[in-house]
Amino acid sequence: MTGKRTTKVDFHLHSYASNVTDYYAVNTFAIPESYSDPLATYRELRAQGMGLVTLTDHNSIDGVKEMLDAHLPGVFISSEMTATFPEDGCNIHVTVANMTEAQFAEVNRLRSNLYEMLDYVETEIAQEANAKAGNRIAYFMTHPLMSTQNRPYGREGALTADHIEKALLLFPCLEVRNGTRTRSLNEFTHRLVTSLDRETIERLANKHGIVPRGRTPWLKGIVAGSDDHSGINQGRTWTEFLSPEGRESTPNDLVDAIRNRRTAIGGEHGGPVTLAHAMVKLLYDGHRKGGAQPGQGTQKNPAQRTVRMGGPIHELLRFVFDSQSTSVWQKVGFQARMTLKKLASMRRKGRDADRAFEAILADEAAALLSDVEFRRKLADAARTDDRIFLVVSSLIHRIFRRYVERLRSAQSLDLIRLVKEGVALAASNVFVSLPYLVSYLHQSSDRQIVEDVRSRFDFGEHKKLVLVTDTFFEINGVARTIRKMIDEAKRRGVDFTVVTCLHDSERAEVIAAADAQRYIDSGQLRILPSIVNLDFPEYQGLQIRIPPFLDLLKYLQESGFTKMQISTPGAIGIAGLMAAKLLQIETSSTYPTSFPEYVENYTRDVSLEALAWKYMCLFYHSVDEVVVPSKFIARLLHQRGMRNRKLLILDRWVDADRFHPKHKIDDFWQRYGVPEGATTFLYVGRIGLEKNLDTLADAFVELRKERPDVHLALVGDGPYRKALEAKLAGEPVTFTGFLEGQELSIAYASADVKLFPSTTDTWGNAPLEAQASGLPVVVSDQGGPQELMVHEVTGYCVKGREVHALVDAMHKLLDLDRRKRMGAAARAFVEQNKLAEPFSAILDSDSYRERFKKNKKVAQHDEDDRSPEAVDRYLVDHRVSHATTEAF
């Protein structure tokens, strides 16, 4: 409609006349659906460029009548009616527009039976020809894919795909853009309504026994509206049509445009954040009015329960909602009060541990507006929605840091105090976040109906994957694997994004050091600012980064991800899982590290190991799918109650070109002081206690007693390095520190034997990289690496933590001919198992699982069979069977 004069109308709007609601959240907070004044709303809509004005209050026309009584031009009567399917009690919302008061009264009387109500409206429309000067009526279903009663999908009275099919027969017009619903939902609704054809309508008519309305019922009118309840977003979403030549548009012109399908939609989409902010605004308005009912001035209703806000909280929100009406003297006075509160808070700092949550909340709210940087951000935020989110998220972060500091500064911390502080920390964040949590839960409850409708109408869905991880910038196997996954997703055209967390103080340095900017620029990496960083107990160099939960939730929902892969069960992984549950999106998690074994290795406390196992089991039972690195881990989880049907083995391998015998340089290790002719045993990986490097050290010392012509090279770094250097003092040992890129490839190919004694590794990049480089390997019989080699063909698999077993294998590999034979077999093994498309278990798990089922023809009982044999039968493994060695 560009270039021609048009008329706009916000076709979904509420005032304080919407005083009855079936929304649980609003009833919980004991607030009405709206405090918006009709006359103020009219002025705002006109300022927003609306040529026609109406209100669609729930089952009421009292608000719009105030506009009519004030003789305001361009106003017409509408109402959003709660109408019922009589066959099962399901309620939907139907807007009837441009009515008379008498017509509204009859529509209101008949709305308990949707069919009777619509029959009456159609009868009135049929009689319009007899009174051409009278009003013409339009009607449409609002937010078609939203349940109006908050009933779980499948419960009696809940909205179903059958109701949607009936609505497509009953309504000649539907609302396809709602200002409180997400872009993805609005676009799906628009696609559903505009893609109908004659064949589909006839099929639905035969199925439900309903005569479709209209001459061409597969062609629908479309409308849009803000669905504003709070006064924040009035006129930001609208319906638009061409204005008549030479005069102003009338409500009848709008109705004609709807009937002739000449309307267009425009304006903003919304989402849970929009709904949450409306709730915050309603709470603020309720507090400001002191419990008075909408439309009653300052008269209070003693029966009405209202949520009260503390002074600083109210002052904070006043700067958000009423900043334009706040005078200079009020701002000066407020700043003085905040300064005094800040000084008082500093005096109370020593007694912080004894302060109640309400006092801390008030302190932080007061301190927030004393923060110059925060006030600058607040002033720069153009939209009210942005200002509210900034206030709430900033408040949550301050409270979280306050409680963490209480825990850090405590001189002693017994179990009861620890539990008390933990509960306070969780409860405070839930309390401040409650409007958001309720809103996200409310809107995500419609996901199942959307999926059902998508299936009914055979609409494909664009798959959009997100991976959340606690580690990306560290040098470890998990981080390297994730980077490979990003590159593979890009190569295959998979929509894949990684989300992680960094503190502002470390962001610039870490990103530059990790060469991660290219991932950020391409949109494949999203870094959220951590609220606080904590050192992991007993694990040097490992940081626990606490993510901003609301920011994560908002980003995930607005991005429209269809599945979440949780890479690590840490703080970000937990936050991701909670967000996915709220958003009701599919979840999968990888099992990257044997965390319980790490706990036991570092603490030597079996009770803590048992506690870690309970946590891991709880976490992995909470996801829909578990991607494991090896059959060893699959059996381990299976023994702890994990169903076979949830388990997939991750299909990944090694870059056989980057790691290759061609990179060998004969004198490479001589540069590090290794004598010419010495047999070089190589270890590559983290130098940590959990890697069983004490076993490696003891074995090397033992071997040296017989063979002085050996040398041990350790590539990597970690918290156990100093202790290991002391343990091996005087021995021919080289510590290189971290090596990367070409230098690492050369280091592998130029060594003689790869040692990997770890019993806790779930996968083992290093043993594969060594075999690809033409080296025989020695691994333990515990963990994933044993599955990445062939015993006595590409190396040796020895009993874990057995020094003499490791010495025996090392002694055998001092034979040059044996080393060459096994090294060649190792390279052949890597070549034979190369993958054209790795990581399908994550990037395309549905196809991966289906391909596996066809190949293995798994019996149904295997899915729950607890025997180890059933695990082997059920699990998909892309690798060549290790039972035969003929190929090598």
Which positions does each model-derived feature cover?
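Nucleotide-activated donor-binding/catalytic signature segment of Leloir-type glycosyltransferases, i.e.
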Residues: 722-742
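Carbohydrate-associated surface elements
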Residues: 632, 653
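Short hydrophobic beta-strand element within catalytic cores of glycosyltransferases
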Residues: 776-779
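Conserved acidic donor-binding segment of nucleotide-sugar-dependent glycosyltransferases
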Residues: 791-792, 796-803, 811-817
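Domain-core and long-helix interface of multi-subunit machines
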Residues: 4-33, 102-239
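Conserved donor-binding/catalytic core segment of Leloir-type glycosyltransferases
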Residues: 467, 675-691, 697-701
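An N-terminally biased module of ancient metal coordination in phosphate/nucleic-acid-related enzymes
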Residues: 1-89, 232
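Aromatic "clamp/platform" in nucleotide-sugar-dependent glycosyltransferases that forms part
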Residues: 759
